[in-house]
């Protein structure tokens, strides 16, 4: 919470390209913590800490607010673009994100379909509650993506029960394709 108050958190954007057209179709919003001395603290360190202390909700709100402040005008001018945002497990387990987004989208006049939400398999603690909250996000127009698929416990059969638009396969599996004998037959 102190990092937010001190202005040390920033949202960076990793572009997303369509491989066929080679056009940029959107970006993923990434939270970064830059210390006063200029060093970056790895999200692998500060995100779990924020989850354990209950401060992750403030960080999620910060990302949502900042991205719409920074990119709202761009999104309004380019309705085909979208930004994806990572949600923590606690964000998925309550309907609060839908309420926060409705207020921010109305304020910035951005369409719900232009903000996608990414959750990890590990974030789907209570599947019944997660399904209900993710479906509510989809019902108003948001896309739902599973990030780092393959690193958790979800099977494809389990995923069929969830309101998911896209699977993002974990990088470790993609990097091994064609190089590792065990994965060379994966198509």
Language-model features: where?
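Short, contiguous acidic/charged loop-to-helix segments that flank catalytic cores in large enzymes
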Residues: 50-54, 177-183
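Catalytic core of bacterial c-di-GMP phosphodiesterases, primarily the EAL and HD-GYP domains
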Residues: 23-28, 53-132
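Nucleotide second-messenger and two-component phosphorelay signaling modules
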Residues: 2, 6, 18, 36, ...
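Active-site core of bacterial EAL-family cyclic-dinucleotide phosphodiesterase domains
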Residues: 1-49, 86, 118, 146
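The catalytic core of metal-dependent phosphodiesterases that act on cyclic dinucleotides
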Residues: 102-177
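Residues at alpha-helix caps and immediate loop-helix transition turns in enzyme cores, especially N-
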Residues: 42, 96-98, 129-130, 155, ...
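Conserved long alpha-helical elements within nucleotide-processing catalytic cores of c-di-GMP signaling
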Residues: 47-48, 57, 135, 184
């Amino acid at each position: 919470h102190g990092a937010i108050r001190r202005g040390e958190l920033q949202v960076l954007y990793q572009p997303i390209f369509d491989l066929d057209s080679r056009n940029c179709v959107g970006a993923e919003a990434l939270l970064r913590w830059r210390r006063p001395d200029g060093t970056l603290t790895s999200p692998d360190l500060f995100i779990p800490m924020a989850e354990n202390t209950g401060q992750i909700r403030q960080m999620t709100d910060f990302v949502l607010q900042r991205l719409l402040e920074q990119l709202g005008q761009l999104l309004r001018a380019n309705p085909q673009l979208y930004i994806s945002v990572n949600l923590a497990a606690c964000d998925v387990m309550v309907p609060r994100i839908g309420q926060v987004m409705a207020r921010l989208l109305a304020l910035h006049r951005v369409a719900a379909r232009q903000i996608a939400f990414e959750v990890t398999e590990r974030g789907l603690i209570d599947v019944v509650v997660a399904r209900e909250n993710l479906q509510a996000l989809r019902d108003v127009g948001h896309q739902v993506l599973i990030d780092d698929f393959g690193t958790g416990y979800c099977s494809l059969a389990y995923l069929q029960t969830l309101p998911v638009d896209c699977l993002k396969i974990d990088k470790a599996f993609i990097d091994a394709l064609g190089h590792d004998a065990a994965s060379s037959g994966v198509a």
